């Protein structure tokens, strides 16, 4: 792991892990709010029990946070996981009308909590792209050794 990967992996991993742990024992009204918001963007979620959905979401967040914090996970994979996770959150943001102003991009006060997750998308893409570059450089070095 590169030293430059530690700050984004630590910041996002700890944040997501903590959020996931907090969802393992949700209160009924909080579970319903999270479930309803997710169901507006992802209609198949409406069929799930709110409590079970939020617990499963929490477990998923724990996995994502753990992947980011585990130094043995390559940067490209950690970045791909974070990009997918944050992409799902931003999809909820963009598909929930009361989250954005009339232009569909800038957040309303209700949208700020999800709009801020764009930083995780940036961190995920950065890790992913840097990790892919590392893989390419390793292959090129290996190939160069074979032909010298």
Question: Predicted regions span which residues?
Answer:
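Membrane-interface extramembranous regions
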Residues: 1-63, 70-148
């Amino acid at each position: 792991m590169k030293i430059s990967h530690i700050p984004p992996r630590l910041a996002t991993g700890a944040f997501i892990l903590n959020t996931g742990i907090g969802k393992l024992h949700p209160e009924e009204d909080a579970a319903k709010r999270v479930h309803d918001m997710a169901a507006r963007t992802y209609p198949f979620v409406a069929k799930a029990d709110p409590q079970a959905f939020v617990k499963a979401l929490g477990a998923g967040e724990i996995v994502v946070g753990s992947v980011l914090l585990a130094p043995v996970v390559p940067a490209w994979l950690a970045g791909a996981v974070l990009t997918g996770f944050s992409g799902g959150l931003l999809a909820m943001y963009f598909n929930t009308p009361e989250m954005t102003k009339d232009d569909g991009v800038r957040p309303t006060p209700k949208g700020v909590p999800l709009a801020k997750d764009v930083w995780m998308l940036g961190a995920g893409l950065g890790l992913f792209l840097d990790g892919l570059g590392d893989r390419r450089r390793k292959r090129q070095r290996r190939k160069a050794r074979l032909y010298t």
